[in-house]
Amino acid sequence: MGLFGKTQEKPPKDLINEWSLKIRKEMRVIDRQIRDIQREEEKVKRSIKDAAKKGQKDVCIILAKEMIQSKRAINKLYASKAQMNSVLLSMKNQLSVLRVAGALQKSTEVMKAMQSLVKIPEIQATMRDLSKEMMKAGIIEEMLEDTLEGMDDEEEMEEAAEAEVDKILFEITAGALGKAPSKVTDLPDPVAIGATAAPEEESEEEEEIEEMQSRLAALRS
């Protein structure tokens, strides 16, 4: 505390170092999230192979769609890491500017990156706090909430889903299910692939699928 109870402003260099540390910490959070989703993906792949052997094409399609959503979530997380690296690089540049000009400068690059990063649920709270600190320091301007973000995700998912489902099933089952140009409606007869599951087994499998879907949804949210 300074005189009359006022908090003294931190030197710009200290602010930049603090921001860089926080960003690196959040990058590790993103890395863990990616690894967790990838581990669940491996379980889904095994479940698809098992379901394919039993001729359960509906189960395979459901799980393949989960794989698609997970891959998209991972791609978004990797994109976030790239943006965070961009901010870190800009912070280094700010230190160079500070040494020459004695003050921090506005950065449109940091502004754009932070606008995207505040929308990532895993790191949202930290990125919002950092944005406020950067606005106060004069590096970025006040950001407006983008309420339109993500509105087209479901439509895009539906348009691309069928082709992607075929591709994933073809790859995971080594060609037993799914075909590059055609849809998964021409799957082999279940009897030809494997024995039909008993009602008890089907109930257990449904529970396992629901649990798997819940875990993946939790990791992606």
Curated annotation (Swiss-Prot):
Lipid attachment, kind N-myristoyl glycine: 2
Localization of this protein: Cytoplasm, Cytosol; Membrane; Endosome; Late endosome membrane
UniProt motif (MIT-interacting motif) ranges: 200-210
Region (Interaction with STAMBP): 202-206, 220-221
Function, in words: Probable core component of the endosomal sorting required for transport complex III (ESCRT-III) which is involved in multivesicular bodies (MVBs) formation and sorting of endosomal cargo proteins into MVBs. MVBs contain intraluminal vesicles (ILVs) that are generated by invagination and scission from the limiting membrane of the endosome and mostly are delivered to lysosomes enabling degradation of membrane proteins, such as stimulated growth factor receptors, lysosomal enzymes and lipids. Involved in late stages of cytokinesis. Plays a role in endosomal sorting/trafficking of EGF receptor.
Quaternary structure and partners: Probable core component of the endosomal sorting required for transport complex III (ESCRT-III). ESCRT-III components are thought to multimerize to form a flat lattice on the perimeter membrane of the endosome. Several assembly forms of ESCRT-III may exist that interact and act sequentially.
Protein name: Charged multivesicular body protein 3
Taxonomic lineage: Eukaryota, Metazoa, Chordata, Craniata, Vertebrata
This protein's encoding gene: chmp3
